[in-house]
């Protein structure tokens, strides 16, 4: 008989390698065939609900790493909540309207002008659905569980109808109005943009300091005086209607050199500006308060017939410029507001495509607005009023889709009033819990400082604004007309608005004082796509009876504070008076390994499919767990390779646990806590503490904490300690001995707990593990999270063992020194003499454990500290260690060096302990002998 046949060497078919790219797909197919997600939902019927409402990604293109981080994070939460006793359905969604889809069709060669609006919209719809299918496949490949066959799409008729009803409720409350205001205007898209559709880039623009001659000084200034203004948009000078100053500033009237003209500047800026203009011998003629200059009139530098009025505003600064601001009400919000106050025209001499209109005169007409800068500067110079031209670096808004600069431009638009409900919205924010908590202030400040929301778009692929016009041009949007449109859209889809005449979209027999002849027209603009996604609380959460409104959680990137978090909050407070969410969790962006934004032009993109094909989705999932998603996250193949190593450690740990519990039946062989060995009690308490820490981290969305605690537990508590000690017990002790069964009870409990706790993170792997466990549920996903158990005197036990672990570290240090001195090779070759204080001796007695076994040495003798020799390695005044090579021979069964080899004459090669085990459990060894 061979010695190895008397050992309980662990065996398992659980493979060492995951082969994830292949096996993950097999598992996902199995889950789909067996409807595991649906089974989980049914299992949790009647339990408290937890609804994470999915922010819809835009249906265009393949998913990127930011998508993966977002969807996987959501999956962690939904899966963990499902296993923690909540009914946690997950309904994925897509944002399916908007300009990028129109642009994709244009790129594909579709001639929009050759099609009717309805035909073009149908092509947009088909394209969007194709993109949804592509992204759905990508998201499912990440292992994300949810209602993939029943997602919400903003193009679905039932969703569009609810969106129209949200609009209707806001109209009913007087929150929808039409106005001509400066809005972000994208000439490249030929449409207004919302704040959330704008991104800022640093640019260099031509700026000009120039004088505007006073023609009516109101008794304060004479006519040989010039107001000095500064602009960074010389192309807007043709639209100038006035000059804005601050009532409280001191303004100096100055002369310089031999120039007879006088110039007005903010007194605080005279020295800086004089140096900039190259003026010498500057004299201050007089100083006046800004308030004294109100209504002073100046000559427009280009148009002699136009006069510019001096106005008092509160947005003027002396940080730069002259303290006098060129004011064009058609091209800026501050300009517009003060222009309204002073009754100025809102003059907008730039068309939808960014070209100067005919009424600007022959020098400007037909020029692209940026080209008009040069003409303005030239005309100022010709007029002799250009004081300084210089480049100016500043942050400027761009269309986030076309990546082209935009302009502020006053156009007739439909607005949703934020101002009327601002206080209510701000109050609602205070009821929301934020992760991280700085998110509350960020959203609060954005709502506090934002203007009204321009909700109209001059495009065709979107939800129509359900507004009619009477014969007198008055807008008609009654509760009756809007609900009628909503029902038509619900039945036929929003294309019906573009297929039917206005009269066929109104309720039968509808009349209005605005149309005595019964003739009506309809609005041609569509709603901002942020109104689409921002209505999802009604289109999805309130509409599906198994969801809740408000939702428990919205989880998106930090850009959504000005996007979806923002628009959803406005529409929800307007609709029902409260926020659409109880909690907001925001995440950073995914950057490349050097901290740069990923882009095709830089060639620094890493896409999820690339990682999945090489390593598997589990590696991306574990990577998401490992990073601080609340901040920007760097992505590199190197980081995935590091995570693959952590995955390998996890897998190997589990493999050991499975291999050493194959002959363990928890129903028959489990040992009660009170009857366990001391070391097993300690590990049982530790794994329960670990369980609580992980469950708490799930509850607080602290993913990175889960990763840290997982890695620490499997490397420190298991691999470096318990599993190391376990080999000397589970391999060597009698198969059914209480000592071995005690340790197997713990090993099995640990692997079950690890499997359940990691199922939200690594479902493909844990389901593979589950097939080797003896649990009742068919799938790990259908199990519950492990219970946190508490035991009598557990803290006392942990403190005792923690003190021993400190002593163990000291012994290991002494063993390492002995190894360096070539006294020993492996630790089991050592004989350790331990010299301990009375306190340590009391601890060792209280441990009631095999200390030699816990130290993994062949021999151990314990002595009073007072007997420690000079050469002992001392640790404080608590203990000292001497290491020598153990005497005796190596037992071929336990691999320890023993002095009692051959004490059993029938088993002459074994130590006494092994001989006793073999004699009692393997009688054939006595007759056959051992080799």
UniProtKB/Swiss-Prot annotation:
Span of the signal peptide: none
GO cellular component: cytosol
Pfam families: Anticodon_1 (PF08264), tRNA-synt_1 (PF00133), zf-FPG_IleRS (PF06827)
Residues binding Zn(2+): 891, 894, 911, 914
Molecular function GO terms recorded: aminoacyl-tRNA deacylase activity; ATP binding; isoleucine-tRNA ligase activity; tRNA binding; zinc ion binding
GO annotation terms (biological process): isoleucyl-tRNA aminoacylation
Chain positions of motif 'KMSKS' region: 597-601
Obligatory cofactor(s): Zn(2+)
Chief subcellular location: cytoplasm
Protein family membership: Belongs to the class-I aminoacyl-tRNA synthetase family. IleS type 1 subfamily.
Assembly behavior: Monomer.
Protein name, per record: Isoleucine--tRNA ligase
Originating organism: Ligilactobacillus salivarius (strain UCC118) (Lactobacillus salivarius)
